[in-house]
């Protein structure tokens, strides 16, 4: 769009801000002012950010498109993940800051949860997009109260009805990020989409397959999930206890890793159809993790590499 170009001042401002972010690994206008020896005032930098009519989403898409073209990228793997960025407990104005469980201490902290999509190719790895996840406060209160009433033995018909959610859940956000990439680059070949255990479910798988019909989706399931072997239900962990794992060497982030693995194509109850399920543990680990893949034609070694 020829009418969406940046002005000279906007280009200078953007160049300085991006350089400051890379050097400081933060976004702090006061710190940027100090870096420029107070040549650029923090309120001036912030003012440009607030007043400039810049389509940030299009700028991100254009940047990705430029890298894809410059490196002649034709195919790659999409990675989905999320991270909690801890904030001060007194924060009030940061978007989507909410209470989260702190895995390190077992307590709670205030954080922003950021969902992000990354493209991994044979040449480069680049970020494609991100979105903030924010839980629905009203729905969380309902769930808390509903659990109390359920524990007290009150039947469902006598408990308050579940309210409609006003925010997207993580699975909807993740599918939205994938869909946006497909809309921007429809001819780019996606070999597979990888996501962690949180996205190991039918809702996420079906949502992605509406965007990329036959793409391989690699994720994880919990050890207590039910699968069927010869028509009989059994938990994943119990099933794989019956089989001795096979030692293999796989490529993990460019390095060779010794692993113990065993895979089989079995029906997973929560999905309603067969998946390639692979029990995998790295050298030094005691417990298996259970990797899943939707495309049954792949080899187990290719799925985990």
Descriptions of predicted regions:
Residues 1-9, 13-15, 36, 63, ...:
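Single, function-defining residue in the core of a domain
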Residues 14-18, 114:
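Short, amphipathic alpha-helical segments that act as regulatory/interfacial helices
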Residues 48-149, 258-266:
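Active-site-proximal, Lys/Arg-enriched surface segment
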Residues 5-10, 20, 24-91, 96-97, ...:
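Electropositive nucleic-acid engagement tracts
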């Amino acid at each position: 769009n020829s009418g969406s170009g940046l002005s000279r001042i906007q280009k200078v401002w953007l160049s300085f801000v991006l350089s400051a972010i890379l050097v400081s690994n933060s976004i702090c206008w006061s710190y940027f002012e100090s870096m420029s020896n107070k040549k650029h005032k923090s309120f001036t930098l912030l003012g440009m950010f607030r007043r400039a009519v810049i389509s940030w989403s299009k700028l991100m898409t254009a940047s990705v498109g430029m890298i894809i073209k410059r490196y002649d990228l034709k195919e790659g793997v999409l990675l989905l993940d999320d991270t909690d960025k801890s904030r001060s407990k007194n924060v009030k104005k940061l978007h989507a800051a909410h209470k989260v469980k702190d895995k390190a201490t077992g307590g709670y902290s205030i954080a922003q949860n950021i969902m992000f999509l990354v493209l991994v190719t044979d040449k480069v790895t680049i970020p494609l997009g991100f979105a903030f996840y924010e839980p629905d406060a009203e729905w969380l209160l309902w769930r808390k109260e509903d659990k109390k009433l359920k524990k007290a033995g009150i039947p469902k018909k006598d408990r308050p009805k579940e309210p409609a959610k006003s925010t997207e859940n993580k699975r909807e956000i993740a599918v939205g990020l994938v869909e946006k990439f497909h809309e921007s680059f429809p001819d780019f070949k996606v070999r597979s989409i990888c996501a962690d255990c949180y996205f190991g479910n039918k809702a996420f798988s079906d949502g992605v397959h509406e965007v990329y019909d036959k793409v391989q989706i690699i994720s994880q399931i919990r050890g207590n999930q039910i699968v069927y072997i010869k028509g009989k239900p059994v938990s994943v962990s119990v099933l794989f206890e019956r089989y001795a794992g096979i030692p293999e060497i796989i490529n993990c982030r460019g390095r060779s890793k010794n692993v113990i693995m065993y895979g089989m194509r079995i029906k997973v109850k929560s999905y309603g159809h067969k998946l390639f399920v692979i029990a995998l543990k790295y050298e030094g680990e005691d417990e298996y993790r259970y990797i899943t893949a939707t495309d049954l034609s792949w080899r187990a070694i290719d799925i985990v590499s």
